[in-house]
Each structure stands twice: as C-alpha cells, then as structure tokens.
Amino acid sequence: MEKSQGYLELDKSWRHDFLYPLIFQEYIYALAHEQGLNRSILVENTDHDNKYSSLIVKRLITLIYQQNHFLIFDNDSNQNPFWKHNNNLYSQTISEGFVIIVEIPFSPRFVDSLEEKKKILKSNNLRSIHSIFPFLEDQILHLNFVANILIPYPIHLEIVVQSLRYRVKDASSLHLLRFFLFTLNKSISSFSKRNQRFFLFLYNSHVYEYESTFLFLRNKTSHLRSTSSGAFLERIFFYGKIKHLIEVFANDFQAILWLFKDPFMHYVRYQGKSILASKRTSLRMNKWKYYLVNFWQCQFYVWSQPGRVSINQLSNHSLDFLGYLSSVRRNPLAVRSQMLENSFLTDNAIKKFDIIVLLISLIGSLAKAKFCNVLGHPLSKPARADSSDSDIIERFVRICRNLSHYHSGSSKKKSLYRIKYILRLSCARTLARKHKTTVRSFLKRLGSELLEEFLTEDGQVISLIFPRTSSTSWRLYRGGIWYLDITCINDLANHE
C-alpha cells in the first residue's frame, strides 16, 4: 500500500510538472534501491545496507551549490579521502534519485498501480522484447536490404539537456541537472562508468527526439502526451523542425516526405545501434543514408559520417541484436512433378528466418561475471558465510532458468546445454569451496539433487500444455519459443 501511495504521489507531481521537491523524498531512494536489487540476477549488491534520507540529500545538494565546491575536483583531492568519498556519494545518490523520478511514470509497475483508478488498458505482449522476433519472422523474409546504423553521440552535454527540456518542464530540476553535469565534466568518464543507468536515460532521451521527429513526419500528426499549453509549444517546436528541414533540403523536401512514408521500411533500435530494413532497392537505402547523416548534423548538431551507416543485402548479412544472431538463409527443396508419362524435377529455394545464440559471446559474459574463464572452464564463486546451500543453489538455478527463458527462441539448443553445464559445475565448485572439500566428494554426498534442479527445460513446460502423446510439444521445443513476458534484456545476453 505504501509503495502504491508513493507511485500516486509521483504521478501527481509529474502531471503538475513539479519534480524538484521529489528529490528530497526518502521513498524515491527506497524505490531506486529496490529497483537496483531487482534489476539483475547477477548484480552483487555489496552496498545493500546503505541508507538514504532527505537530510543526506539536502546536505549533498547544498554541497554542490557551495562556492568552494570546486575543491572536490582539485588535483589534490586524491590526497583528501573525505572529499573523494563525498564526491562519489552525492553523485551516485542524486543521479539515482533524478533518474527514478523521470523513469517511474513510464514503468510497467507505475501503470499497474494506477490501473484501477484510471482504468488504463494495458498490453503486456507489446512490452515484451521477444514480441519483435515474431514480427521479424513474418516481415523480414520479404525484405531485401538492411542498413546497420551506429547512432552518433551528442558532442556537448548541453545538447542533451536541451533535448530533455521538452519532456521535463520543471526548470529547477533541469538547472540541477545542468549544474550537476558541468560540475562533473572533468571526471565524466569515471562517473559514467559508475552511473550507467543515469547516462543511459540521458542518451535515450536524446535519441527519442529525432525518432519522434521521424514518426511525426511519417504520421503527419502530433503524438505528444503533454497537456494544456505545453502541447501547443511542442507542436510549434515540431513545425519548426519541419521548417528547418525544408531549408536544408529545399530542392527535394517532398521526396523526403515520400521517403519517410515508405510502407516497406522497418526500424529497430538496440542500445547504440539501429536497423533499417526495406524491400526497396539499394538506391533507396543510400538516399536514407544521405538524409540521416544530414539530419543529425543540421538539426541536432551531432557530427556523423557516412561510414557509420553500412548497407548490406539481407541474403548475405546477419543481424546481431538483443543477444541473437538473425539471418535469412535459403533451404534448397526439390519437387518432383508428374504429368502423364513425363516427370519433372524442379529445384526451389525456400527462405527461412534463422535465429541462433552466439555461444562465444555468452561464454564471454559468463567469464566477465566470474562463472568461468575465457575458455569456458567453470570457476567457483565466492559465497557469503551466512548463505545456506539451498540459497546458493537457488541463485544458480535462477540464473540458468532465466538464461534458458530468454534464449528460448534459438533454433539451435546445443549452445544452451553448454551454458547449463558451466553454471551447474560452477555451482558445485562454489559449494565445494564453501565446505572446503573437492567437487567429486561433494557431488557424491549430495547425489542427484543438484542435477535435478538444473533439469527443468522449456520442453517440459510445453509438455504441460500439449498432450504427451502429441509431437507438437517436441516440434515447438526444437524450434523457437517466444515468451511475451520478458520486458528487459538479460545481463548475460547484453554482451556489448
């Protein structure tokens, strides 16, 4: 009940464009801490005992606005552990609070908490990451060319703030964000590594701006969610973008609009990359390449080069995104036809959308998480002294099942067997290390209990739906299985 009340307070402040006071609310940091615990099954939460309070946040913000705040970033700051500790403390705390304030109104849990009050109709299937693959299976077989795009980064932090102000109307919050970013400008590299979620939000906000421009040009209507006078100002802003586009491409602006409305164009964005797939010719794809580069440079002041957009033919190229390697391959098929006394043998080629899991990338992610080495040999994980054997086994089994669940769409399951073997043996070595014994003697004492925990397969789940005598479950298990309840990328699949 308290959590739902917190979400309702967030909604009230969000709709009144008054976010700055929320930074001083303790439940904001409780929500941020809870999301950090549940975000990944692989995160080792070593700072789970840290407590946030409004008093700490007030002191940290006061410290930012003090006249001598530059002492924190002085060259001698490394000699003063107190200032170094405060630097890390307030940057981590305030960035988490700011992101959670802006992110929560768009989160599924927030929508669920308001469902009864506002009668919001939701569709969990559309939120699923896996929902894109059935769409690709139906559409990509009819497409010819694909453009792999490396999305350019903004050259200055002020561009990011300017992009965000069309979504966040609270001037105080934007002023704090601007001051916060420029204060940390000298140590932005190390800060971005510690606060990846913060910079990921800023980056997505910036990319959303030019994506919304494309959508606006395509639909010829405003899809913005703002109310009152805000919608009018934003509509003016979008018409200003169109006017600027007309000035840049004065000769062929109508051709550009016709290009944007191409019904055979499909767009997918994943992290810092995006994919444009089309049924048209390579000439049409090169036009897209030209317009995109000029649009980034002229409208969003982002330096880009044509080399960041590569055009390939789908029949000779594989798509690498969301932890899968997707490609269109041709299966030869010979058909014998009989006509009276003559028979004909016809060779046909059937297109098939093939999706596999990159085993090398998965092993690399497991090695980065210290489950194995770079060659795939399992390693033991350090276990806490107060962790029971069942807790350790449950953690490894949860990781294994989540990986199997996420990569269930692969048409080749053998790579998943190797991953399960690594996790199972890593679990056994972790338990043997805790009990100060060998893996062989520990497995002999434990028996088959450890193995049974890892034997829950997706095929067994499907067999509960279909009759055991039917071969449907086996055919489905051998092929791709897409789950429509996956709303985030598994950290092990996120190997980029």
From Swiss-Prot:
Main location: plastid
Keyword Chloroplast in record: yes
GO molecular function: RNA binding
GO biological process, one term: RNA splicing
One protein family per Pfam: Intron_maturas2
Task performed by this protein: Usually encoded in the trnK tRNA gene intron. Probably assists in splicing its own and other chloroplast group II introns.
Entry's family note: Belongs to the intron maturase 2 family. MatK subfamily.
HAMAP family: MatK
Protein name: Maturase K
Species: Paeonia officinalis
